[in-house]
Structure formats: C-alpha cells, structure tokens
C-alpha cells in the first residue's frame, strides 16, 4: 500500500479504484488489482 499526500493520482491509476473513508483516514481500494491500494497520510 502506498502512502500518499494526495489521492488524486492514485484514483486515476485504474478505473476500478474507489475512494473510501475508514477511521478518519482516506483510502483508495481496488478489488480487482490490489496493488493499486493507497492511503492518504501527511
């Protein structure tokens, strides 16, 4: 999982990427290609 400052580029890497919010953090998840997972962290 990548930790990124902005998830805009992470969301556009694949069309199946979705943004979800869990426990106050923002994640990009992708069920078909899990290597595209990312989390926003400052």
Swiss-Prot record:
GO CC annotation: ribonucleoprotein complex; ribosome
InterPro entries in the cross-refs: Ribosomal_bL36, Ribosomal_bL36_sp, Ribosomal_L36_bact
UniProt-recorded Gene Ontology molecular function terms: structural constituent of ribosome
One of the Pfam families matching this protein, by short name: Ribosomal_L36
Any one Gene Ontology BP term: translation
Keyword entries, A-Z: Ribonucleoprotein, Ribosomal protein
HAMAP family the UniProt entry points to: Ribosomal_bL36
Family of this protein: Belongs to the bacterial ribosomal protein bL36 family.
Name the UniProt record assigns to this protein: Large ribosomal subunit protein bL36
Record lineage: Bacteria, Pseudomonadati, Pseudomonadota, Alphaproteobacteria, Rickettsiales
